[in-house]
Amino acid sequence: MNEEIIAKAGEIILQKTGAESYCVLALIDGDGYPTASTISVSKADGINWLTFCTGLEGRKAKRIEKCGRAAVCFNADGAYNITLVGTIEIVTDPEVKAEMWYDGLSMHFSGADDPAYCVLRFRTERYNLFIDWKEALGTL
């Protein structure tokens, strides 16, 4: 049963990638408190990993520099709740930045080679999935 729910979660995440969709990214601030903000997923491999694009000098990047623990949540009015917990890192490799670039980012950055632009790579360690009134908990 977990495999079926995990596959459905991966399909939902795939549908929620790009500039038009959002999820909630929770990080730990400099004082040790949780913070949550909406962000678009640029790419994903099911529930295994997700990437986000943001500014290197922004608050998200600063928080990740201090603490690489994070959670991601996708939710739709009772239809599903996908919560992933894991680690997150800042990636500035030019090839990765180019691969993760999407058109919506041009409102914030001059291009994939903009030094202010970075990629955040989230890797799931554990999950809590609730889809079609079925729940799956586990670790990867």
Where are these regions (language model features)?
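A short, Trp-centered hydrophobic/proline-enriched beta-strand micro-motif
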Residues: 15-30, 70-74
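Histidine- and/or cysteine-centered catalytic micro-motif in compact active-site loops
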Residues: 28-30, 40, 55-57, 75-77, ...
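Short, surface-exposed beta-edge/turn micro-motifs
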Residues: 20-22, 48-50, 67-70, 115-117, ...
